[in-house]
Design a protein with these regions (language model features):
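Active-site-adjacent segment of SDR/Rossmann-fold oxidoreductases
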Residues: 38, 59-70
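Active-site loop immediately N-terminal to the catalytic Tyr-X3-Lys motif
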Residues: 40-44
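Active-site helix of classical SDR
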Residues: 12, 49
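C-terminal helical subdomain
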Residues: 73, 89-125
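Residue(s) in the substrate-gating loop at a strand-loop-helix junction
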Residues: 33
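Short, flexible catalytic-loop segment of classical short-chain dehydrogenase/reductase
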Residues: 76-86, 90
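A short helix-coil junction within the Rossmann-fold of NAD(P)-dependent oxidoreductases
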Residues: 14-24
Length: 142
């Protein structure tokens, strides 16, 4: 929670007054996770922190509507890194860190609030979130 959520809150709180003073448009880009869509096995704190970050980004988006600050949320699926190399569970539709970095950069340049990737995995996660909480639903990700 400290890194995935509170660090963002503290950094943005420290930066907002400076950003509002700027004449040019500023962009705050928060990187969430598809783990914010549904709870995943053995990842309760991670999922909760990313869900909090998603809600925070949505709130900031509305709070800064009539200012020079543009808020973006990037919601990736699994990204291959040294951390994910240690995972012992399936990571469907995993993308490279280079691909993720490219998508995050493009998100900062887009007109959309939220950028998700891979899109097909996003829709799978959304579909699972609409199902009743049942062990067989989460088995799709194991």
């Amino acid at each position: 929670m400290n890194i995935n959520f509170l660090a963002h809150v503290h950094l943005i709180n420290k930066s907002v007054s400076y950003l509002l003073e700027q004449t040019n448009k500023s962009t705050i880009c928060l990187v969430g996770s598809m783990a914010s869509i549904i709870g995943l096995p053995n990842a309760s704190a991670y999922c909760a922190s990313k869900a909090a970050l998603t809600s925070y980004a949505q709130t900031l988006y509305f709070d800064f509507q009539n200012t020079n600050i543009d808020v973006k949320l990037v919601t990736p699926g699994f990204v291959k890194t040294r951390l994910t190399d240690k995972n012992t569970f399936k990571m469907p539709m995993i993308v490279t860190s280079e691909y993720a970095a490219d998508q995050i950069y493009k998100a900062t340049e887009s007109n959309k609030f939220e950028t998700v990737f891979p899109k097909r995995f996003y829709w799978v996660m959304k579909y699972l979130s609409w199902l009743p909480m049942h062990k067989s639903a989460i088995q799709l990700l194991r």
